[in-house]
């Protein structure tokens, strides 16, 4: 009788919060006000850049502890090294497949839409001074250099830098070592597990400053580049936005449907984070919040800790679409004939160079420069054509990358039987709060067959 009454007891309901008290509402207001200020008073808008930069720096300050604590406690609690390798392998298969689809989609759309045809630009007439710094940075993006850079100089150096993969590398090794230590490692695991609570309280505190950061960042973008630059290259920008939307709704929508959840409900669930990414033009700004929300949606902490940080370097769907679409736009605008062999070379180089792109604003432009440097058939001077609108495309790149990593985390969790489907439904429907958090122990998932 006691069990029956408990089973029939109504579930606790989330207290109603008016929309004007929720974070996403104030981020929207901040973006609108920032855009208006940047348009009406461009000089003032440009001077507000430190607000956006300061918020990004505050978030990046907490990213390393979040990743380290999540991965170490997740792996050490699993206590099976083979599980870690299996999750990582499944994630890399997913990343490779959908990154390839994104690159192919960019190529196909460029051939169908022809965004650069008819511009008849002579590369010799383009001013290359503004892109020189991007080209110089792109020379450092080599495969060997990228792999070697994953290994930090010391055990502590990843925590004073901004290389997510170095933090991931150290965290995985430390988590495995802690798991192998057995009972003697329990005190350390308990300490790290306890530390996650104040760290994520700090994340919640920083997220309350998101409207200020979004306001400053969007005011700077509109003030510096203006909306006029969008008119001149509107066909390219529009093609990129529509292609990214197609990728999210059709391709990611299909894999979401097959995995048992709705892409539209997922987007609604992550609306605050997506608005933050839109305002700051950086998917990295919402990384800590994404990790916590994926656990709240029913993913095991150990899977989230491995998939999300790795995806920020290896699963950049928006950047991949941008690279092939922008490269063919430059070729079309400069009347450069690309044979199928040239396009295959471009595709293969883009597959490699995109894996080192960071989750910060402007990284996609540097990656494009690295790709065109290796494929000389496309004049790198043509990058000057899109420099003025790259910031506007950067926002779409970041949004697509962010959604892609959220979907990847849910899909890999499902493959691993590490997804609580009841908790996912509650989170995506928004009917009740998801009580589990990153500082909670992993619960047994409820997996639908």
Curated annotation (Swiss-Prot):
**SUPFAM superfamilies given in the database record:** Proton glutamate symport protein
Cross-referenced InterPro entries: C4_dicarb_transport (IPR023954), Na-dicarboxylate_symporter (IPR001991), Na-dicarboxylate_symporter_CS (IPR018107), Na:dicarbo_symporter_sf (IPR036458)
Question: How does the record classify its membrane topology?
Answer: Multi-pass membrane protein
Gene name linked to the record? dctA
- Write the protein's name: C4-dicarboxylate transport protein
PANTHER family xref list: AEROBIC C4-DICARBOXYLATE TRANSPORT PROTEIN (PTHR42865:SF1), PROTON/GLUTAMATE-ASPARTATE SYMPORTER (PTHR42865)
Listed under GO biological process in this entry are:
L-aspartate transmembrane transport
Where in or outside the cell it occurs: the entry states: Cell inner membrane
> What is the species of this protein?
Xylella fastidiosa (strain 9a5c)
Under the heading HAMAP family, the entry gives: C4_dicarb_transport (MF_01300)
Query: What is stated as this protein's family in its record?
Result: Belongs to the dicarboxylate/amino acid:cation symporter (DAACS) (TC 2.A.23) family.
- Annotated membrane-spanning segments are 20-42, 62-84, 91-113, 164-181, 202-224, 239-261, 344-366, 370-389
Quote the function comment for this protein: Responsible for the transport of dicarboxylates such as succinate, fumarate, and malate from the periplasm across the inner membrane.
